Amino acid sequence: HAKFAKEKMPTLVEVFATVPAGKKIFIEIKCGPEIVPQLQKEVEGAKLKPEQMIVISFNADVIAAVRKQIPSIKAHWLTSYKQDKATGQWSPSIEQVIATLKRIDASGLDTNAHALIDDAFVKALRGEKYELHCWTVDEPALARRFIKLGVDSITTNKPAWLRKQLDLH
């Protein structure tokens, strides 16, 4: 957009500097694992505690590389679900999700707020000691559902509005 033409893109270190004490930043990696050595330098130079930084990616190889090269920070695999039109089956199944999380040594799952996420899904993940984060939750009823399920966090486009609707302060 023209009104932002002269704006400078902040560096990752500059973004890290905006994270308040006790809060977390989710760093989504959109490319492949070739970025991890540079990310490692940025993370190691950050004035944040390791527990404040969480890497997320749809690319399982990125998560595996982060867990190997930067084991001090959490890395969550991102996934969404597709339905087979012929069988009606959804994939990945919870079994496939857990197998992938184990294979790549992920710290947890960050997934879309799908109807598949139910008590059994959460129990299966918790049984394996994985975190669960959901996106994009912009409606109070959906937020209440995922809060009741006990997810670790939700991602929303309307944080202030949603907190007010849920009477969270």
Regions found by a protein language model. Name each.
Residues 2-9, 85-169:
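C-terminal active-site rim and adjoining tail of enzyme catalytic domains
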Residues 1-83, 104-116, 126-128:
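Metal-dependent phosphodiesterase/phospholipase catalytic core, i.e.
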